[in-house]
């Protein structure tokens, strides 16, 4: 039996709704004076971060500690990885220490999948972002934020995002957040539209379960949520658009553009935001922008995922896709 | 042989609707009597059926005391000691009344008291939420077979059972009718949920 969360595409609708509902209960723990549950007492979780990410790591760490797990943080910098140790050797070291779960962030797409399926380690593997491939807990926390804002906190329990129209704007090519979101939102019944310059769309995007547009202004009036993606300059090895100014003019969200959105529509961003380029300060600081909520929701979602994968003697989350990988 | 006969035996009702209403009324009066007016009582039901019973008790207490009775629910799933013996369960709702439980008399309400492990988990959960003045326990049915030194303060009906029997509580809010059924346990032996 598999007990990993590698890709948002692995989740069935029922799994995804179960995770969102569980996260809603976990969010209540955050409102209490003692934000701790004994659920994972005696279990060891390793945060294995081969790529820098303070935000995701502390989010996972907070979730693990709130569930009383023993947490080991591993960053590649200054470890034996910089001396040339392979992923396999690292995994076998962790296995020998009796680790129950590994939360892995890696710059290589597919590293978590390799770790989960190679037989090197018996622990549950949770993908915390691999290359340009997937970031499933980010997609889940985004869906959670949308459900809370668009359907309602208590009214949303048991429900998906059927018929909601979500627009993702920006650097789709380099974005694991976009890939994970398209997969999950499609599973949850939402209609997704990608808006980006043609140079920032991946080959084969026409096979994804979503619409593609190059024109942000015409998409805004029919969007329930608009998610801006960070332009990932660190992954860009060529010129994908002429100037930042032009990108900002065509694909950035400012106050005037936000006014074209329906009144109930929300603005989302996975962070970190590049203010002035993808989003103006006016939009980022408005009460329609959910960036800070997304961070808080991230802890609840990660608690839910860890509870459902590790809380019992077998995971509660099933797997739609058994072995093949994109 | 015996077992097969048991399994064929129909579950028989030991408490019907009017009996349940009557024992809840009695428990409500006992709470008022023991808590000397029930001024600081908070009722917390344990999902699923304990919550319905807590609400019914609150209604009855309101009739007696003519005061609004704070009532909530306490999910104990995350505090169970058998979590790792089963797949993880979906969580139920924990709702603590606005004024909290600090310094109050918390009455936990559940449908069946069996091993006592659920109540142990509930006491742990309470510990994380606040510090009540005292905690009491009200159950509709006490079927015995305790595995921990825990007893109820208010019992609707003491029901001596064998471990081969099951006690099933049905309430109108969830099951469409009020009844307590005593039946034979199907096949594999396992712990009380």
Swiss-Prot record, chain B:
Organism per entry: Streptomyces coelicolor (strain ATCC BAA-471 / A3(2) / M145)
Main function: Regulates the transcription of the pyrimidine nucleotide (pyr) operon in response to exogenous pyrimidines. Also displays a weak uracil phosphoribosyltransferase activity which is not physiologically significant.
Name of the protein in question: Bifunctional protein PyrR
Gene that specifies this protein: pyrR
PANTHER family according to UniProt: BIFUNCTIONAL PROTEIN PYRR
Phylogenetic placement of the source organism: Bacteria, Bacillati, Actinomycetota, Actinomycetes, Kitasatosporales
Gene Ontology MF annotations: uracil phosphoribosyltransferase activity
A Pfam cross-reference name: Pribosyltran
Short motif (PRPP-binding): ranges: 106-118
Catalytic activity: UMP + diphosphate = 5-phospho-alpha-D-ribose 1-diphosphate + uracil
């Amino acid at each position: 039996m598999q007990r990993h969360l590698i890709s948002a595409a692995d989740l069935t609708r029922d799994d995804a709704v179960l995770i969102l509902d569980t996260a809603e209960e976990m969010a209540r723990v955050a409102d209490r004076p003692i934000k701790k549950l004994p659920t994972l007492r005696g279990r060891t979780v390793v945060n294995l971060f081969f790529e820098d990410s303070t935000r995701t790591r502390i989010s996972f760490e907070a979730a693990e500690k709130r569930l009383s797990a023993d947490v080991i943080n591993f960053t590649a910098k200054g470890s034996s990885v910089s001396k040339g140790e392979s992923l396999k050797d690292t995994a076998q070291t962790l296995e020998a220490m009796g680790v129950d779960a590994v939360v892995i962030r890696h710059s290589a797409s597919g590293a978590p999948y390799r770790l989960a399926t190679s037989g090197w380690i018996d622990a549950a593997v949770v993908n915390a972002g691999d290359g340009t491939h997937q970031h499933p807990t980010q997609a889940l926390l985004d869906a959670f934020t949308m459900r809370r804002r668009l359907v309602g906190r208590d009214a949303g329990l048991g429900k998906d995002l059927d018929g909601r129209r979500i627009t993702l704007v920006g650097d789709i090519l380099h974005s694991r957040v976009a890939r994970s979101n398209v997969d999950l939102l499609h599973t949850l019944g939402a209609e997704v539209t990608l808006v980006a310059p043609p140079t920032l769309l991946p080959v084969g995007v026409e096979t994804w379960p979503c619409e593609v547009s190059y024109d942000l202004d015409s998409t805004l009036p029919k969007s329930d949520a608009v998610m801006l993606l960070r332009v990932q300059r660190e992954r860009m090895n060529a010129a994908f658009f002429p100037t930042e100014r032009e990108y900002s003019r065509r694909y950035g969200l400012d106050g005037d553009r936000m006014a074209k959105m329906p009144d109930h529509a929300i603005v989302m961003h996975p962070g970190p935001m590049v203010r002035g380029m993808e989003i103006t300060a006016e939009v980022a600081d408005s009460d329609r922008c959910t960036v800070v909520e997304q961070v808080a929701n991230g802890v609840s979602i990660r608690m839910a995922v860890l509870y459902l994968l590790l809380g019992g003697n077998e995971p509660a989350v099933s797997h739609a896709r058994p072995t093949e990988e994109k | 042989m015996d077992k097969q006969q048991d399994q064929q035996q129909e579950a028989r009702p030991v408490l019907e609707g009017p009996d349940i209403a009557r024992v809840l009324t009695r428990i409500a009066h006992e709470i008022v009597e023991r808590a000397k007016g029930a001024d600081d009582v908070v009722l917390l039901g344990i999902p699923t059926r304990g919550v319905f019973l807590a609400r019914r008790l609150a209604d009855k207490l309101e009739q007696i005391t003519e005061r609004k009775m704070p009532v909530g629910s306490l999910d104990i799933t995350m505090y169970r000691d058998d979590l790792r013996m089963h797949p993880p369960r979906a969580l139920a709702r924990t709702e603590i009344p606005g004024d909290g439980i600090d310094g109050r008399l918390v009455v936990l309400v559940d449908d069946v008291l069996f091993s006592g492990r659920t109540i142990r988990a509930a006491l742990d959960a309470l510990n994380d939420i606040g510090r009540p003045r005292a905690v009491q326990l009200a159950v509709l049915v006490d079927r015995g077979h305790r595995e921990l030194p825990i007893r109820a303060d208010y019992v609707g009906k003491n029901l001596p059972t064998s471990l081969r029997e099951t006690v099933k509580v049905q309430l109108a809010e969830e099951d469409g009718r009020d009844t307590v059924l005593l039946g034979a346990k199907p096949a594999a032996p396992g712990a009380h949920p």
